[in-house]
């Protein structure tokens, strides 16, 4: 369950039972691991999901936690980025950056400010509540939090990430806080964690061996969803999750 970093938008093919806004790939990490370990999978991940969509509905889409039962034995969770405006902020800043660089007008979204401390604190509380509710509904399940792959290099930027220094550093700060929150929630609730944020360093959108799509440019279109894992990135997460479970 979780957001687009669990669902895999832009990675073919889409799961036939996917509601329109969710874009669940048959090659997302949950599907890959379920196939390798011969597990029965219920995939409720959904692009654009926030923590509120795990506990409550998203339009006609039921709460993701409703997929749990006492018989559930494994729950994977990637969530939190949308609560912080993480990828949305990166996209808006990149649109503005490319417009400034090229002089070509673009229909950019308004800039998203760095999350306030209260926003980070509220996310930590909501993620903790989710972990506890998973435990209540599925007491025998192994809970695994999977955090977000690195989008940007540890310093600087590149043509695939047209960001000024302020925007790039702000995104890195948000990513670091999200990883820290995820780790603490997992530790506090006896859950396991796959630290994609760590092992994906060096495979960011600027890397020659990128696991992450960058921002599309006229001369360099993106084959997939911008600032989201590509097929290699999703497989790397699946490999790490499989290693944890074996």
Predicted segment positions?
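Structural recognition of the beta-strand scaffold that forms the well-ordered cores
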Residues: 1-2, 6, 40-45, 73-78, ...
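Short, solvent-exposed beta-strand-terminating loops
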Residues: 7-8, 81-96, 147-154, 198-205
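A structural motif corresponding to the C-terminal end of an alpha-helix
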Residues: 32-40, 125-144, 177-195
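Short, well-structured alpha-helical segments in soluble
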Residues: 55-71
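A substrate-binding/cap region within the structured catalytic cores of diverse enzymes
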Residues: 71-111, 119-120, 126-133
């Amino acid at each position: 369950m979780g957001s687009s970093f669990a669902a895999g938008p832009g990675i073919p093919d889409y799961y036939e039972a996917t509601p329109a806004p969710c874009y669940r790939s048959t090659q997302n990490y949950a599907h890959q691991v379920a196939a390798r370990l011969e597990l029965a999978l219920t995939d409720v991940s959904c692009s654009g999901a926030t923590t509120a969509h795990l506990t409550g509905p998203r339009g006609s889409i039921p709460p993701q936690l409703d997929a749990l039962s006492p018989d559930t034995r494994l729950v994977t969770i990637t969530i939190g980025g949308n609560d912080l405006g993480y990828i949305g902020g990166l996209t808006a800043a990149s649109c503005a950056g490319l417009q400034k660089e090229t002089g070509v007008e673009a229909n950019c979204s308004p800039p998203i400010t760095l999350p306030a401390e209260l926003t980070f604190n509220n996310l930590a509380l909501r993620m903790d509540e989710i972990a506890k509710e998973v435990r209540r509904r599925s007491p025998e399940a192994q809970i695994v939090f999977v955090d977000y792959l690195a989008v940007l290099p540890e310093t600087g930027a590149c043509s695939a990430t047209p960001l000024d220094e302020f925007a790039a550093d702000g995104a890195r700060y948000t990513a670091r806080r999200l990883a820290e929150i995820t780790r603490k929630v997992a530790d506090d609730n006896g859950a396991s964690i796959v630290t994609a944020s760590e092992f994906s360093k060096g495979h960011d959108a600027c890397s020659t061996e990128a696991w992450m799509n960058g921002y599309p440019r006229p001369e360099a279109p993106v084959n997939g969803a911008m600032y989201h894992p590509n097929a290699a990135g999703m497989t790397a997460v699946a490999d790490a999750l499989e290693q944890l479970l074996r």
